[in-house]
């Protein structure tokens, strides 16, 4: 019984490692990204999360950046006339991936995320709640951007 489990686990591990080399070659493009953002706290948080996620793809040639990712992060708060109403925070991001040599836009897209903040009486608590909601939205957007950039890099296109 133990032999069967060991055999099955080796078989599964070998099947899953067949495609890793080609993916690693394509994903090396992620080490060649330069990120530009607007100078808000949330956009800097998104930039740092993306840089930390792609630090493993840095190679000897990654000092020379081939691609520029331009991030434009905007947020808005919707509320009603009532002071203690539920507030909706919407954060949207527009991004472009540009090849530096030819200045060609390779990808241009946008998406948004929403968060609700409950009714709070204290002004300080309301501000803290909005700050925390913005941080959560920033982390959510950065995770989504990481996935989108990995999908872009793994797409089989010669650039």
Feature annotation, model-predicted:
Residues 37-40, 44, 128, 132, ...:
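Charge-dense, low-complexity intrinsically disordered segments
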Residues 51-53, 57-110, 114-132, 139, ...:
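Surface-exposed short loop/turn segments
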Residues 1, 17-21, 46, 97-109, ...:
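Hydrophobic transmembrane alpha-helix bundles
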């Amino acid at each position: 019984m133990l032999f069967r489990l060991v055999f099955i686990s080796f078989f599964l591990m070998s099947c899953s490692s067949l495609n890793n080399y080609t993916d690693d070659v394509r994903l090396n493009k992620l080490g060649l990204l330069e990120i530009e953002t607007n100078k808000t706290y949330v956009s800097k948080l998104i930039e740092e999360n993306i840089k930390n996620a792609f630090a493993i793809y840095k190679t000897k040639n990654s000092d020379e950046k081939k691609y520029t990712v331009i991030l434009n992060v905007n947020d808005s708060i919707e509320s009603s006339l009532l002071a203690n109403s539920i507030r909706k925070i919407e954060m949207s991001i527009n991004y472009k991936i540009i090849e530096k040599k030819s200045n060609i836009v390779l990808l241009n897209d946008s998406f948004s995320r929403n968060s609700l903040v409950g009714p709070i009486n204290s002004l300080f608590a309301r501000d803290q709640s909005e700050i925390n909601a913005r941080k959560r939205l920033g982390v959510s957007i950065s995770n989504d951007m990481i996935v989108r950039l990995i999908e872009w890099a793994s797409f089989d296109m010669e650039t």
